[in-house]
Swiss-Prot record:
GO terms for cellular component: cytosol. Its cofactor is Mg(2+). The lineage of its organism: Bacteria, Bacillati, Bacillota, Bacilli, Lactobacillales. Belongs to the TRAFAC class TrmE-Era-EngA-EngB-Septin-like GTPase superfamily. EngB GTPase family. InterPro entries: G_ENGB_dom, GTP-bd, GTP-bd_ribosome_bio_YsxC, P-loop_NTPase. It comes from Streptococcus pneumoniae (strain CGSP14). Residues 26-197 form the EngB-type G domain. GO terms for biological process: division septum assembly. CDD domains: YihA_EngB. Necessary for normal cell division and for the maintenance of normal septation. This is Probable GTP-binding protein EngB.
Amino acid sequence: MTMELNTHNAEILLSAANKSHYPQDELPEIALAGRSNVGKSSFINTMLNRKNLARTSGKPGKTQLLNFFNIDDKMRFVDVPGYGYARVSKKEREKWGRMIEEYLTTRENLRAVVSLVDLRHDPSADDVQMYEFLKYYEIPVIIVATKADKIPRGKWNKHESAIKKKLNFDPSDDFILFSSVSKAGMDEAWDAILEKL
């Protein structure tokens, strides 16, 4: 599907804890998942050419609800709570887990998940679990490796290979190196997203 999007026409629509609060229409949605402080808010702001549409926080674990971003009345980003944040109670983490699982497995509007990992580090057990979960439920996935600007370009391949190996990456999925500082990977990310709509 080819879609002309005015990405400047974007706003946060609503925050939801369960399906009774989800938007009630048929706009396609792309969910964004990743561990706390992987750069999800920076990814959203970069992709939508905004400084602080999604609030970046020095405190991980800030997003506790599903945040729906309306983009040009044609599609939505859905920011899901960052996982793997230790200073949240086990009970709270389980609640988030159920909320995320309910959204990912029952939402008909969902077209794909952008799974964000930090290019500098091996994927965490949570990253691997998320990828396996998406593959198990046959949910299309785009891996975006953030913070590419923090690593010399000559080492990108090495880090990419390490991540792919740890994830047991399916080569039919998209893998994009991304930097919210230099905007590297932004066009590739949009191409991959629009292809899924």
